Regions:
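Conserved, mostly hydrophobic/aromatic
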Residues: 6, 18, 46, 59, ...
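Active-site mouth loops of central-metabolism enzymes
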Residues: 16-29, 73-83, 115-116, 210-218
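A short, structured active-site edge motif that brings together acidic residues
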Residues: 69-80, 102-106
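Active-site groove signature of glycoside hydrolases
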Residues: 92-115
């Protein structure tokens, strides 16, 4: 699988990332099968978080034989120093490793999140201390609002961002365009979430897939256009949704390595007009 450079870090990552939620609630045997499949396909970027149920517990043993050859990203959604330190210790234990390559503030959304993270006893001080100790290599964040992401970048020199760069949000709301521009100017590593999300669920609508809180693409053809769009942006990699069908589609599309055509781009722009984007949230 093709690899791209993760901004100024110089790390070479596969253009498809393995979303740890894939192994959430799976058996040890199934988790091992999924990780082995990813490795066979050339994936070296794995992303997980404590709030993905038991994903860390299932990913750790399955990934252990390959740990020295992969780039492991983890997160903490806690905003205080002590909480992050506790989260990190538990993540190391569950993931069967002695270090995390990329540790990220998870789902930063509100001004309050940012204020708590940046406070004297906030999460960011813990992240810096962990990096100084050598148990994490890079510091990043994922965000669900552009405002929160831009505020974080105003206050700290992060290595990476993880953000929903998606065809519907991009074309309907210009969501992420300011952030993308700033990240490029600073040569940050740019990672994408939700490339295969199609629309927000309607009120009372049941999930089509248990591990997806949004409605994903319907067909392989739609997935192909959507993922090719995200990969046409100056990103390093796109993390897959939590269901194997979409993981398989993403790998096939990446292996095919076809550029987005003008006709496909126009189709995506037109399709986006009729859809309710997943971000910004109401």
């Amino acid at each position: 699988m093709k690899r791209r450079v993760l901004g100024r870090t110089g790390e070479q990552l596969s253009i498809i990332g393995f979303g740890g939620i894939l192994v959430m609630d799976e058996s040890a045997k199934e988790s091992e099968r999924l990780v082995n499949k990813a490795i066979e396909k050339g994936i070296n970027y794995f992303d997980v978080a404590p709030n993905y149920g038991n994903a860390q517990q299932m990913l750790g043993p399955a990934l252990k034989p390959y740990r020295d050859d992969v780039f492991l990203a983890c997160k903490s959604e806690l905003r205080d120093y002590d909480g992050v330190m506790s989260d990190f210790t538990e993540s190391l234990k569950l993931l069967k490793t002695d270090h995390i390559d990329l540790y990220q503030l998870h789902a930063v959304t509100t001004d309050e999140d940012v204020n708590r993270i940046l406070s004297k006893d906030g999460a960011l001080n813990a992240f810096q201390e962990l990096r100084d100790k050598g148990v994490i290599r890079y510091i990043g964040f994922s965000a669900h609002t552009e405002e929160a992401a831009l505020r974080l970048l105003d206050h700290f020199d992060f290595d990476t961002i993880l953000f929903p760069f998606n065809w519907v949000t991009w074309h309907k709301n210009d969501f992420g365009k300011k952030l993308m521009k700033l990240a490029q100017e600073r040569n940050l590593g740019i990672l994408a979430l939700k490339a295969l999300a199609k629309r927000a669920l309607a009120k009372g609508e049941e999930k089509a897939y248990p591990k997806a809180w949004y409605y994903p693409v319907d067909t392989f053809d739609e997935a192909q256009k959507a993922l090719k769009f995200t990969l046409s942006l100056p990103i390093t990699a796109a993390v897959t949704p939590g269901h194997e069908k979409f993981f398989n589609w993403a790998c096939e599309i990446a292996e095919d390595d076809q550029l987005l055509t003008e006709q496909e781009l126009e189709w995506l722009k037109k399709d986006a007009k009729a859809l309710k984007p997943i971000f910004p949230e109401d």
